[in-house]
Amino acid sequence: GTKALYFAPKASYAASADAVAEFAEMVDALHENGIECLMEFCFAPGTPSGFVLQVLHHWQLRYQIDGFHLVGDASLAEEASKDALLRKTKLIFLGFDGARIYQGKRPWFRNLGEHNQGYQYHIRRFLKGDEGSLSDFTYYLRRSPETHGVINYLADHDGFTLYDSVSYEQKHNLDNGEDNMDGSNENLTWNCGAEGVTRKPAVRALRLRQLKNAVLMLMTSQGTPLIYGGDEFGNSQKGNNNAWCQDNK
């Protein structure tokens, strides 16, 4: 893969020639309006923990970033949670042992968060009526560890949008140019009786009801709900569950 430039804002995202100043102004504007700014980083396996912390320190000190979602090695959670500079910065990882990190004690400030992939898996199973899914559904609905927060979601940038999860049972990634070989084959979705776009009133009504059921479960679960941008108005990627390369809305 391409080596990332971890210390610089992406210039192509900026409207001006000065991406650094523009990014800083954006963060300031968010803070002035009571909105926190969290960034997501993906570090390759084996990346030295010292380098990872150096990157986080840079963005926290230079731009006053409020938190980070670190994709990849969750073993960094323990070291990052003990870092003096990051002790009040939100740190989100995919899976870690909070009980071991805090030795069974409740931390004075819960800055660790779990990107709760298990929630998506089991709530989607329950939503589409899979047999034997009730016990896992009730567990994840009420799960709230004392040591860290949980971020619950039913869709994110990896996989189907929420609307597509009730509209497609198969991925449709041919536009990506990889012969539909990319993207996950296990999506835990139900198309409500027709694959993709349909004019059938009964199918469309059922999809809307399933969307409402999904949002209700997400908003009433213990933890912090995460809504993928666009899901609030039923955005569709036309069944593409790996749309990172698509220049569209």
Regions found by a protein language model. Name each.
Residues 1-36, 45-62, 175-196, 248:
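Aromatic- and acidic-residue-enriched carbohydrate-binding clefts of CAZyme catalytic domains
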Residues 7-8, 14, 154-155, 161-163, ...:
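Generic, ordered loop/turn and secondary-structure boundary motif
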Residues 21-106, 114:
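Active-site neighborhood of glycoside hydrolase catalytic domains
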Residues 42, 46-48, 166, 172, ...:
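Short, function-defining helix-loop hinge/capping sites that tune catalysis or transport
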Residues 77-229:
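Conserved alpha/beta catalytic core and glycan-binding cleft of carbohydrate-active enzymes
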Residues 228-233, 237-239:
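Short acidic/histidine-rich active-site segments
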Residues 237-249:
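Extended hydrophobic/aromatic segments used for targeting, binding, or gating
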